[in-house]
Amino acid sequence: SFKEMKEMINLKIQESAEMYLETILVLSQRNPSVRSIDIASELDYTKPSVSVAMKNLRENGYINMDADGYITLTVKGKEIAETMYERHTFLSDWLIRLGVDQTTAVEDACRMEHVISADSFDAIKRHITGIENS
């Protein structure tokens, strides 16, 4: 149905925005000066597609961009980025400990981090942390 298709598109847009925000966070940990070209090379995306995404993120209040093109996360952008990064590192580490090879674990964690609800992620995290601490 059209409604389902619209929801799928919105989910893809949300997933893409989360991916960009997480990438900006990771890049800024390596080097505080992040530009669109850095994001493009990190994700292997074209510069024009990154520019469009940055415009959308800026208009929605997730990033700031100065006159020289340097990008910083806003408070709400950083919150989302940190949530995605925590999910990504936790899920990929967990999958690796379960015996999944690193490449697959990282790819799967990358997909899972965007679709899992906060409730489910927190429950998994509590369960695993509980097992490891007992």
Segment roles from a protein language model:
Residues 42, 80, 97:
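Residues within the alpha-helical elements of helix-turn-helix
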Residues 1-4, 107-134:
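C-terminal regulatory/oligomerization modules of transcriptional regulators
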Residues 85-118:
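Arg/Lys-rich, alpha-helical DNA-contact motif
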Residues 1-16:
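N-terminal leader segment of winged-helix/HTH proteins
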Residues 16-19, 35, 76, 87, ...:
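N-terminal positioning helix adjacent to the helix-turn-helix/winged-helix DNA-binding module
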